[in-house]
């Protein structure tokens, strides 16, 4: 796949893989996922498979990079459909936040800083088991299919 952002918004000619984008506002999410919106910043608008919205919480890896959205803003965006299965939460994500991210209707979560901080730990199996358990609804089998995190 290919990941686009404000600086790099061009898709290589004849590209056939998945396309994602970084977003830092609800407006960017709406612009990215609304197939009726006009041209993208540098040419025809691509069809995005998913977008990352950040920062949802204070960044773990970028010290001083604070969250941008209030709980109320995220709740409203989830209820209105701005946040949906194509929107991946990024920024300050830890396993304990999974229930809240689900309540806001995020389609998934990116655990960058938390994973990076644990790179020297030897309990990866325990960490991944914790994430899987938080992703699996109570009483359901854990059957992550790769297309949706939840």
What are these regions (language model features)?
Residues 1-33, 49-54:
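Catalytic beta/alpha-barrel core
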Residues 4-12, 52-65, 98-134:
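Glycine-rich phosphate-binding active-site loops on the catalytic face of alpha/beta enzymes
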Residues 7-8, 26-29, 71, 95, ...:
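Structural motif corresponding to alpha-helix initiation and N-cap regions
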Residues 9-13, 29-30, 71-79, 128:
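Short amphipathic alpha-helical segments and helix-helix/interface helices
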Residues 12-13, 31-39, 43-48, 130, ...:
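CE4/NodB-like, metal-dependent polysaccharide N-deacetylase domain
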Residues 20-25, 68-88, 131-135:
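Alpha-helix-loop-beta-strand connector modules within alpha/beta enzyme cores
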Residues 25-37, 46, 83, 88, ...:
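Catalytic cores of alpha/beta
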Residues 42, 138-145:
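Short, low-complexity, charge-dense intrinsically disordered segments
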